[in-house]
């Protein structure tokens, strides 16, 4: 929902206080995303959406276009928060280069995407970094060395103990952590075609699971970090199945400073924030 200025403007017009700009990558030819069905859904006994699966990658829009739009959005909405999600190879120079470009936009902060479980982890990014606390610490330290922007580390739930990665973020000097990213999953199997679903070009794949069904997992992991002595005091951004103000309040009750919402916005629209504002007031 926050992949371009058009959608970010809609979010701010609806009343959202800030956005997480869809993950940017390195300069050069844009990444080629999946062409075809990128999503799968899990419904309960009625049409209510319980879980949502995606195998989408990071932005497939040119870096220069994204950066120019971020500059304009900050000019148009100086009182709103714009944090830019980033994912580049686990190389110091790659991070140094992207940090300089993002800092020039006037963005309020960066979120290090160490959680994506599909497509990018096979390239040594995303969850491949987030599952190794030493890598989390190393990249967070690079970001604090080369940028003055507030640095948030987004954590993967696809790990035995999420506290180990959170501790790495703290040691690296991160200003905050966010969790959870999506959970590695296979949405189902098309028994007629004997392929995982969703499938594109006769090929299926695992993807990232989110939506209301993951909220209990997210709450547990958040509470683990909030109660950890080595992570004491670090701000936490809660993610995972937040659909209404009660969900948001539950995350905050367990230690979140704020919450992020994606799936519910995709399914119900930006104006769901109105109920959240009323309820939390």
Task: Identify the role of each PLM range.
Residues 1-83, 87-92, 276:
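N-terminal capping/small domains of soluble enzymes
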Residues 2-3, 94, 161, 243, ...:
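Short, glycine/acidic-rich beta->alpha junctions
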Residues 8-14, 18, 75, 89-237, ...:
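Alpha/beta enzyme core
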Residues 22-61, 114-131, 183-188, 205-206, ...:
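Glycine-rich, proline-tolerant flexible connector loops at the mouths of alpha/beta enzymes
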Residues 275-276, 281:
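C-terminal flanking segment of RING-like E3 ligase catalytic modules
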């Amino acid at each position: 929902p926050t992949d371009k200025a058009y959608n970010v403007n809609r979010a701010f017009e609806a009343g959202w206080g800030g956005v997480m700009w869809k993950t940017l990558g390195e300069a050069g030819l844009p990444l080629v995303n999946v062409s075809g069905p990128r999503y799968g859904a899990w419904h309960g006994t009625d049409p209510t959406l319980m879980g949502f699966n995606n195998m989408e990658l990071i932005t497939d829009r040119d870096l220069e276009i994204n950066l120019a739009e971020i500059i304009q959005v900050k000019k148009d909405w100086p009182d709103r928060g714009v944090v830019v999600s980033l994912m580049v190879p686990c190389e110091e120079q790659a991070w140094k280069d992207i940090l300089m470009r993002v800092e020039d936009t006037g963005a309020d902060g960066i979120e290090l995407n160490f959680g994506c479980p599909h497509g990018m982890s096979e390239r040594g990014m995303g969850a491949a970094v987030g599952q190794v606390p030493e890598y989390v610490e190393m990249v967070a330290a690079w970001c604090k060395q080369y940028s003055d922007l507030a640095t948030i580390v987004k954590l993967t739930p696809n790990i035995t103990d999420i506290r180990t990665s959170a501790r790495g973020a703290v040691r690296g000097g991160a200003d905050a952590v966010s969790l959870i990213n999506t959970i590695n999953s296979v949405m189902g199997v098309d028994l007629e075609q004997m392929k995982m679903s969703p499938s594109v070009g006769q090929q299926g794949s695992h993807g990232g699971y989110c939506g209301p069904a993951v909220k209990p997992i997210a709450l547990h992991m958040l509470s683990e970090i909030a109660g950890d002595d080595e992570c004491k005091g670090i701000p936490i951004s809660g993610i995972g199945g937040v659909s209404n103000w009660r969900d948001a309040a539950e995350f905050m009750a367990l230690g979140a400073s704020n919450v992020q919402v994606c799936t519910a916005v995709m399914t119900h629209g930006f104006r769901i924030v109105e109920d959240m504002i009323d309820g939390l007031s």
